[in-house]
Structure formats: structure tokens, C-alpha cells
């Protein structure tokens, strides 16, 4: 129904012919149809996800923030009749601003932690235990603690955990602070790069949503495994408490993109 309304209002895509096969099929596609995708993501998330989860909160803010940038871009193209849409520098400023919000939130939030195994000598800092039969290496009870950390994982490498505090090693007592600064900068780069990557991918009808659905499915698996202590330990993946809730968001995202492809 929303698609029909947009088509009646002639809010459609104008295509510059580049001679690509299937390119002209995108002509007339409702330009502001992204509003439907946003609703299809946000409504299920609000209904089924834990809204007190910091990762869900960040995803809701990111979805609305980037959706607003896309809305302004389409509005300028369609109603202001400026073919270029929102100027590139304003898009980048918006993306960098979002990256800064995400990075700083991950830094200051007490709910953003990783869980590590500890030795018996560190038993004083233990916050939880993994019962016998749940750990693949020793099949014994394992002591763990939740810590604030700048560690990340590097794919395809053995012993692949990397600590951004390494960049601050020369600064002595300020190594951890430098590590968080590097972490926030990298977060900004990732948010900006992924956002622009989606823009660059878009062009043929369904191309961006099709690839996004595949990427979303992969990230959903990783989020589930990383948020499950048993699977994370078995697969030697960093366990991040509460990150499994992201599966709800990703399921809504995949459903929205597949629904878009259907119509």
C-alpha cells in the first residue's frame, strides 16, 4: 500500500543510462521506499528485543540516524529537484558523528564487557563459573571474569585476539586510554566505510538489499555464537555477554531486506 502511494505521488527513481544489463528496471522504483524497510526493522525490534540491552540501543539509534540521512538525500532529490541529493560532505559528517557516538558508548557503558577465563590465583576477581561439561578444552569447571577491554579478534589467524592498547605501549600508564582512542577511531572508520559501501553497491534494483541480506545472515551467526558461552568456547571465539540479543535485530533486518526483494 505504501509502495502504491509513493508511485501515485511519482516519488520514483530516475536512472542515468550506463548501458548495464537490468539497470533500467530500477526506473520508477519508489525512492523513499526505504521508509518501509526502516519500519519493518524497528517495529519487530521494539516488540521482541530487550530494549535495555546496550547493543540493541545502539542498533536502533544507528538505524534511525542513517535512515534520516537517506531520507534527507531522497527528499532533496525528489522534492527539491537536486539530482545530487544531500552533499557528500554532509553524509560523511553524519556517518562520522554516528561512529563517534557508537565508539564512545562502547567505551563508557558498563554493560560492554568481554568474559575471560582466569587462573586459580585470580580467584578473587571471579564473577562467574562455567560448570563441568561446558568447556571443550578440559571438561572441568572453569573460572571466569567480566572485564572492560579493548581486545578484538582478527579472522583467519590462530591466537587471533588483538588488544588496541598495544598502540599505547609507548605511553606507559596511558596505554589503555590510547587503546580506547584508537578503538573509537577504528569504529568511526568502520561505520563510515560500511555506510558508503552500501551506497556504492546500490544501483541495480535489489543489488544492495540482496548483498545486505547475505551479510546480515553471516553477522547473525557470529552474533549468536559470540553471545553463547558454550559455542564461543568450543569455536575459540571471544565471548561477549548479551551480544546474542543482536540476533533479534538481525532477523528483523533480514526479513525487511527479503521482503523488499519480494516486492
Predicted feature locations:
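N-terminal alpha-helical transmembrane segments of multi-pass membrane transport
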Residues: 1-21, 25
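Alpha-helical transmembrane segments
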Residues: 1-7, 37-68, 89, 101-135, ...
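P-loop potassium selectivity filter motif centered on the GYG triad
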Residues: 147-175
Amino acid at each position: 500500500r505504501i509502495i502504491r502511494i509513493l508511485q501515485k505521488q511519482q516519488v520514483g527513481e530516475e536512472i542515468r543510462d550506463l548501458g548495464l544489463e537490468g539497470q533500467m528496471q530500477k526506473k520508477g522504483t519508489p525512492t523513499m521506499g526505504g521508509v518501509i524497510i526502516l519500519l519493518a526493522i524497528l517495529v519487530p525490534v521494539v516488540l521482541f528485543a530487550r530494549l535495555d540491552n546496550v547493543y540493541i540501543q545502539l542498533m536502533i539509534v544507528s538505524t534511525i540516524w542513517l535512515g534520516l540521512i537517506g531520507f534527507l538525500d531522497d527528499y532533496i532529490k525528489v522534492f527539491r529537484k537536486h539530482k545530487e541529493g544531500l552533499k557528500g560532505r554532509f553524509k560523511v559528517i553524519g556517518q562520522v558523528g554516528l561512529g563517534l557516538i557508537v565508539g564512545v558508548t562502547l567505551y563508557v557503558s558498563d554493560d560492554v564487557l568481554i568474559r575471560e577465563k582466569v587462573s586459580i590465583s585470580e580467584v578473587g576477581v571471579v564473577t562467574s563459573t562455567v560448570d563441568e561439561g561446558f568447556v571443550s578444552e578440559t571438561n572441568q569447571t572453569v573460572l571466569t571474569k567480566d572485564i572492560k577491554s579493548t581486545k578484538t579478534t582478527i579472522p583467519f589467524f590462530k591466537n587471533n585476539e588483538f588488544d588496541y592498547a598495544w598502540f599505547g605501549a609507548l605511553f606507559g600508564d596511558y596505554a589503555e586510554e590510547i587503546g580506547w582512542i584508537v578503538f573509537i577511531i577504528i569504529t568511526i572508520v568502520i561505520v563510515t566505510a560500511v555506510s558508503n559501501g552500501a551506497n556504492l553497491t546500490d544501483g541495480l534494483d535489489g543489488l544492495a538489499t540482496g548483498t545486505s541480506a547475505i551479510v546480515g545472515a553471516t553477522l547473525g551467526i557470529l552474533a549468536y555464537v559470540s553471545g553463547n558461552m558454550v559455542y564461543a568456547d568450543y569455536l575459540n571465539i571471544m565471548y561477549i555477554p548479551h551480544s546474542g540479543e543482536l540476533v533479534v535485530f538481525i532477523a528483523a533486518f533480514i526479513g525487511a531486506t527479503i521482503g523488499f526483494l519480494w516486492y
